[in-house]
Curated annotation (Swiss-Prot):
InterPro entries cross-referenced by the UniProt entry: TLV/ENV_coat_polyprotein
Chain spans, region Fusion peptide: 384-404
Organism of derivation: Homo sapiens
Positions bearing the site annotation: Cleavage: R383, A384
This protein's name: Endogenous retrovirus group FC1 Env polyprotein
Domain notes: The CKS-17 immunosuppressive domain is present in many retroviral envelope proteins. As a synthetic peptide, it inhibits immune function in vitro and in vivo.
A cellular component annotation (GO) from this entry: plasma membrane
Motif (CXXC): 251-254
Motif (CX6CC): 466-474
Localisation: Virion
UniProt PTM comment: Specific enzymatic cleavages in vivo yield the mature SU and TM proteins. The CXXC motif is highly conserved across a broad range of retroviral envelope proteins. It is thought to participate in the formation of a labile disulfide bond possibly with the CX6CC motif present in the transmembrane protein.
Pfam families for the chain: TLV_coat
Glycosylation positions in this chain: N69, N247, N272, N276, N308, N313, N322, N334, N342, N346, N478
Amino acid sequence: MARPSPLCLLLLLTLLTPIVPSNSLLTEPPFRWRFYLHETWTQGNRLSTVTLATVDCQPHGCQAQVTFNFTSFKSVLRGWSNPTICFVYDQTHSNCRDYWVDTNGGCPYAYCRMHVTQLHTAKKLQHTYRLTSDGRTTYFLTIPDPWDSRWVSGVTGRLYRWPTDSYPVGKLRIFLTYIRVIPQVLSNLKDQADNIKHQEEVINTLVQSHPKADMVTYDDKAEAGPFSWITLVRHGARLVNMAGLVNLSHCFLCTALSQPPLVAVPLPQAFNTSGNHTAHPSGVFSEQVPLFRDPLQPQFPFCYTTPNSSWCNQTYSGSLSNLSAPAGGYFWCNFTLTKHLNISSNNTLSRNLCLPISLVPRLTLYSEAELSSLVNPPMRQKRAVFPPLVIGVSLTSSLVASGLGTGAIVHFISSSQDLSIKLQMAIEASAESLASLQRQITSVAKVAMQNRRALDLLTADKGGTCMFLGEECCYYINESGLVETSLLTLDKIRDGLHRPSSTPNYGGGWWQSPLTTWIIPFISPILIICLLLLIAPCVLKFIKNRISEVSRVTVNQMLLHPYSRLPTSEDHYDDALTQQEAAR
């Protein structure tokens, strides 16, 4: 079974031990003025608000202009638009300040003052224009007078998609607050501490501990506070020291978040109830607490009650009324912990398993190597799907190899069919045995029924049960021999499946022999070589004839080239006939 992912003592100490800060970090964190830019727009029937950007004034105060940097407006899509902002406070005309302020936000007319987005070609433009853009990804909104008191109460403006639009598409709000700036190191530690605290609160809720219960402390006067993994690991380290384990400087105590933090360990003897113990709250202390089982001891050393005497080595023989557990001890009864045990002899709880236990932190001790293997598991190497191509053999060789592997696949299919037949025989033998047993049970049931009826009617003096009932007599037929035969068949098949296939006697033929796996891959190249040897003489003879013919024609042409044909008498006769025909 795979081990759970551990939460180690080393990691906890690393998270909770802060880095030694410098002198500047030990002083009280400074306070600064911070500007916020919020955008509000309507999305369907829902009103949405988001923080576009924040910017801090200089440490000595807001004595110089500040600029917001943000990527985009939520209500204006980048591209086919030119965002424009209107404020009421910087309007010079009374019509722009007094009319349709809630609707238009200072720009009900075209002559009102509007801050149109300008292309940010130089940094000096920020001193001239309030709203600029680099044309790609960033907008710049400048506050020229951050020292003005209006920003503390907040300034509201309207956002238009185009300067010529009649109505705005969103609302902007800019305000200034005095905040406490936390250094980055302390901020990171604070976030980690908050996360650990949240996890401990969740686990504390799951543990369902009593606020006054002595859960993980050994002093019965101490009150257990909220559950803490640090406290759990500390108690685990204390137990390790008490156990006398040495040379643990390079070991790790680990616990798992997915498992209960405590485990109940059975004690070898009953509690000493003679002394006066501190009063504990009555009732159930905790539920679903797992019990530790020693794999080397099949029995529990001591039990107060048990449903089976074989489970315990020793059972409590005294009275189980009004028993109290001392500090650090509990009664474990069916996954439930309690400090008091009050069981009468006729109570149903007397048939449950109740043990004296002590709660121990559920920790695991790992060495350096074991922890390294858990945190960084070894990488599994992937096997090559087509090894000939991976190791650099040519594609032709790979194709030939894949073709030769067909024989091995055929042999594997034949072996699988043989195995399927044997399994089928085993299933049939098992079914036959079960059917035989069922027939025996049916036969016994019929005989018992007939005997019961015969004995009830006492009809032995009238010819026996069969004659009185007027039906055939049924007797038990011992079919155990058939069962034994079927079992022997199963044993033979089992031995045949486990025995290596080394004998040459196969029911399917010689092609199912293991030797076939080695022979078949060589058949294809042998056949190819034989085919080449068969056609090689014909090919060679054809090539030889062609070469001879070409050589003969070439030699004749070279020898007859200087000679020409001489005229004969037949040639003169042909010329005379030609002239006569032309004269006619």
